[in-house]
Swiss-Prot record:
Heterotetramer of two alpha chains and two beta chains. Gene3D superfamilies: Globins. Involved in oxygen transport from the lung to the various peripheral tissues. GO terms for biological process: cellular oxidant detoxification; hydrogen peroxide catabolic process. Red blood cells. The modification N-acetylvaline is found at residue 1. The gene is HBB. It comes from Ornithorhynchus anatinus (Duckbill platypus). This is Hemoglobin subunit beta. Residues 2-146 form the Globin domain.
Length: 146
């Protein structure tokens, strides 16, 4: 993904404020609530029977933190997202059989979470930069499918 200097600054400045544990759990939790069919990949996480159960589930929170840690890896490797996510792409494609559109959904949910937590900093320009990034990450994660 190609981000201009200003876009890189916008993304990294906001990322520096992110609490990975808190926002990761919220992003993954929202994905599971808003798109309930994605829960089938997380049956081992226990109770996902309601929005409250999902959002309070410690396994959802822990896995969400792992997901956002991977987004942090993307920020360090903007010039090689496909390489950065090659193993995760293979895992999600070959073993988990995740619909690659779910990567786009997660990216869009992450943008909602960021806008909610950092509304003063989340200008249209910042949103556009983040949209570019999450689209690039989703494409890299879906690479094994192509």
């Amino acid at each position: 993904v190609h981000l201009s200097g200003g876009e890189k600054s916008a993304v990294t400045n906001l990322w520096g404020k992110v609490n990975i544990n808190e926002l990761g759990g919220e992003a993954l939790g929202r994905l599971l609530v808003v798109y309930p069919w994605t829960q089938r990949f997380f049956e081992a996480f226990g109770d996902l029977s309601s929005a409250g159960a999902v959002m309070g589930n410690p396994k959802v929170k822990a896995h969400g933190a792992k997901v956002l840690t991977s987004f942090g890896d993307a920020l360090k490797n903007l010039d090689d997202l496909k390489g950065t996510f090659a193993k995760l792409s293979e895992l999600h494609c070959d073993k988990l059989h995740v619909d690659p559109e779910n990567f786009n959904r997660l990216g869009n949910v992450l943008i909602v979470v960021l806008a909610r937590h950092f509304s003063k900093d989340f200008s249209p320009e910042v949103q556009a930069a983040w949209q570019k990034l999450v689209s690039g990450v989703a494409h890299a994660l879906g690479h094994k499918y192509h």
